[in-house]
Every structure is written in C-alpha cells, then in structure tokens.
C-alpha cells in the first residue's frame, strides 16, 4: 500500500481587525490545502459585538452556506476561541465581519502542498 505523507508546519495564518463588511483574513495559496486548527476573536470594547466567520471555497461568497460562526455574540472585553479541524482547498478564504468595530481575529493552522 502506497502512502503519501506531507509535512505540515504550524503557523499563524492571518490576523487583523474585523470590520462591518466581510473581509478576507487568509487565502489558501495555489496547489495547497490548509488545515485550520483554531481562531481567536478578541472584543476590545465595552459592549457585546456579534461576529460572523466563513470558510469560503474558491469562487464562493461568504454567508450562511459556509458559516463557521454566524451572529455569535462576544461579550465586552472577552475572547472567543474556536477549535476544530477544517481543511480549506486552494484559493479558498477565511472571511469575517462584525456588527461593530472593536474585534481582532487571529487564525492558526498549517499548509500542505
């Protein structure tokens, strides 16, 4: 039986400030698959903020059909941590938006070619 193993090196894939419109925080390079291990969203404001995160396939649009978080409320001065095991294929993206300014996202995982 032939087995094709690939080295996957863990790394920070993306980080940034979430706005009120969907923004791409990570795009999978060509000829690559990406393993999303976790993402953290930190609310740095005095009020709750609702967030939306989608793992969007190539030529797709962020929304309910590919949501990982949808209208999830993050309390004031709190951090939401999502842990899982999701694979995104070449040219797919991780996109997020929020109901108001004041959140940052950090995405970690690994890439395999």
How should each PLM-predicted stretch be described?
Residues 1-34, 38, 97-113:
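C-terminal interaction-tip segments
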Residues 17-23, 73-80:
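Solvent-exposed, conformationally flexible loop/turn segments
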């Amino acid at each position: 039986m032939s087995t094709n193993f690939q080295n996957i090196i863990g790394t920070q894939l993306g980080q940034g400030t979430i706005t009120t419109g969907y923004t791409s925080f990570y795009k999978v390079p060509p000829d690559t698959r990406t393993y999303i291990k976790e993402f953290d969203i930190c609310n740095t404001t005095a009020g709750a903020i609702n967030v939306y995160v989608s793992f969007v396939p190539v030529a797709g649009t962020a929304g309910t059909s590919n949501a990982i978080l949808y209208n999830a409320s993050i309390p004031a001065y709190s951090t939401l941590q999502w842990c899982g095991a999701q694979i995104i294929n070449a040219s797919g993206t991780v996109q997020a938006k929020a109901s108001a300014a004041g959140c940052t996202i950090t995405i970690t995982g690994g890439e395999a070619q």
